[in-house]
């Protein structure tokens, strides 16, 4: 039997979640980051990664880079709500520009002895990770790259004696001569 046409009947859709990197240019003043985070937490949106820094070329402005997931409609809603905030100057969905560069840095501490030590160094070389601290019992590696490369490196270090990881979060910038 067909459903009656009604303003109250909403066809259920199951759009897949997508991951998007948003770059948000804001006034660098107290409370702005808390307001942006409040927008996400108040509506139940998840933040996968968050980085914030004052921009070099425009003083008193900061760039917030947020990696978030949601359906296309949720992502659109997040961008619209960010755009309406008073201290926000611009919101760019780096995922949609198609020509952006994303990088992350991680420091990875691994216990290292015997064969595990040799294997950890071999993997670090393969991933172009640098040794930034070494003792007879452990290493600290520094690795940069996209998030999946860093996650893969961490996964390979687990069986070798992974102790701890500190990740910076994603930084993103568009390619070419134009700015944000």
Question: Where do the PLM segments sit?
Answer:
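Long, contiguous binding/interaction regions
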Residues: 1-62, 67-180
């Amino acid at each position: 039997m067909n459903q009656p046409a009604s303003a109250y009947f909403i066809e259920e859709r199951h759009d897949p979640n997508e991951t998007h990197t948003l770059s948000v240019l804001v006034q660098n003043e107290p409370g702005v980051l808390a307001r942006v985070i409040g927008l996400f937490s108040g509506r139940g949106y998840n933040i996968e990664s968050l980085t914030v820094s004052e921009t070099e070329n425009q003083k008193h402005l900061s760039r917030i880079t947020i990696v978030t997931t949601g359906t296309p409609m949720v992502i659109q809603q997040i961008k619209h709500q960010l755009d309406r905030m008073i201290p926000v100057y611009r919101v760019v969905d780096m995922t949609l520009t198609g020509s952006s560069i994303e990088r992350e840095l991680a420091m990875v501490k691994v216990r290292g002895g015997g064969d595990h030590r040799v294997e950890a160094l071999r993997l670090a070389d393969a991933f172009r990770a640098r040794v930034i601290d070494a003792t007879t019992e452990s290493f600290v590696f520094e690795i940069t790259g996209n998030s999946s490369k860093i996650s893969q490196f961490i996964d390979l270090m687990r069986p070798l004696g992974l102790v701890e990881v500190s990740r910076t979060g994603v930084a993103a910038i568009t390619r070419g001569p134009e700015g944000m």
